[in-house]
Each structure stands twice: as C-alpha cells, then as structure tokens.
Amino acid sequence: MRVKIISDSTCDLSPALLERYDIAVTPLCVIKDGKDFHDGVDITPVDIFAHVDGGGDLCSTSAVSQYEYGEMFARYANEYDAVVQITIGANFSCCYQNACAAAQEYENVFVVDSENLSTGQGLLVVAAAKLAEQGLSGAEIAERVRALAPKVEASFLIERLDYMRKGGRCSAVAALGANLLHLKPCIEVRNGKMAVCKKYRGSFEKCIRQYVKERLDGREDIAPELAFITHAAADANVVAAAKEEAAQYGSFE
C-alpha cells in the first residue's frame, strides 16, 4: 500500500523532515506589497520579518485554492493507492473546505482537518507519514490522525506585541503597555481556536524557561516520540534555553 502524505505549508516542517518522510507541500499564498508569493517557495519567514522590520506593511495570506488542491491531487492520485491531505485548522483558514471540494473528484483522496497550525499541525503530518511507512491504508491513516488531532498540545509565547498591533489584533496602547511591563502572552490552540491562556513577565529567556517547565513538569500524558521547539528568528540563547529546559523532562526525538 503506497500512500502519499500532503500538508499545507503551515505545518512549518523543515526541508530535512519533508524529504525524510517524502511529504509533499501545498503552499499558501503570501501577499506582500500587493504581489503574490508562495510560502516556502519564493518567500520565507525571514523575508517577511525583514520586510516588516524595514518599515513595510504587514503581509497577509490567502488559502490554497480548490484548483491548486485539485492539481496536487491529480499529480498523486493515480500514482499512489491513496492520498492523505492534512490542512491547517478549519477555524484558521478555508484551506480545509477547499481541499474537501477538490477531493470530491477522487475516491482515494482523504482530507484531514488538523485543528492546528504550525508544528502542532506538523506533529500530525509526521505521525501520518510514519503510519504510511507501516503500510496502513489512506482511510486508516486519516481516521488515526483525526483521532490524534484533539490530543495535540500547541502553544507559543509572544516576546513583543508589535506585530499583533500592526495586524490590528491589539491597540497601540495595549502593545506599548505590554512591552513596557515586559509581559509575554502565551497563546494556546484549544479546540481548533487560539486563546490567551496566561501572561508571563520578565526577560524572554526567563519566561521561556518558566513556560516550558509549566508545560512539561509532572506530565504523564505526553508521548515522548516527538516534540517541536518552534521559533521565528528567536535569539539563539532563548532557543538554547528552551531546549535545555525541555531536556529535563524527557528524551524527545
């Protein structure tokens, strides 16, 4: 049984992992200065940060279209016994709806709503790829991944609210106050939606250590096979602190 795993680019998996598990990617569209780019193809997060930090407007995104999903499915549906497409959470984008519409033309294409984004979605994509290596059918993989989706724990800490202010998600006054008070909001994905679960205070490295400890300390419900430490051009010392803290609570892949 040969099953092709496809994911939206929002899974944020490294090129090495994509190659290791032979995962195909459907890139979202990134709109910068009125021009369309494909996420991970001709524009990267580093490009976006450099653009905005240089005074440019905040970039926006648009979903993978039904036509683009259809092209991807046409490429693999005949070559493989089945195709499993894992999308960004349906509450974050219309990618899932577009993929479902495109999949109606195929009996062997299965679409899964990850209920997540970034490497929360990435965890499910890797899980699906491992199941494909074990020889499970497309239907079985889709069923297993749908069952895993609510069990994924994905959260992140925001160092500064500048980007949220530019995106209209908080006022300039709120952003200034949070930055002055060194407040670091923790955003958690719950039931397919994002919500603020806690606010930390202090240096980013200190907050990261406390955050990781609270996420992992005393937990007996965590699968040790794989965990992702995901960051957007964070300081190397902060990334090292997160890894060091996480290593105290298990030997993750």
PLM region spans:
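Short coil/turn segments at beta-strand junctions that form active-site/ligand-binding loops
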Residues: 1, 80-82, 223-225
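Mixed-charge interfacial surface used for oligomerization/domain docking
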Residues: 4, 10-24, 28-29, 95-110, ...
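N-terminal glycine-rich anion-binding loop in soluble enzyme alpha/beta folds
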Residues: 4-65
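Hydrophobic residues in alpha-helical segments
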Residues: 52-53, 77, 132, 165
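Glycine-rich phosphate- or other oxyanion-binding loops that anchor nucleotides, phosphorylated ligands
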Residues: 55-57, 63-90, 97-98, 142, ...
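Short beta->alpha junction loops
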Residues: 63, 114-115
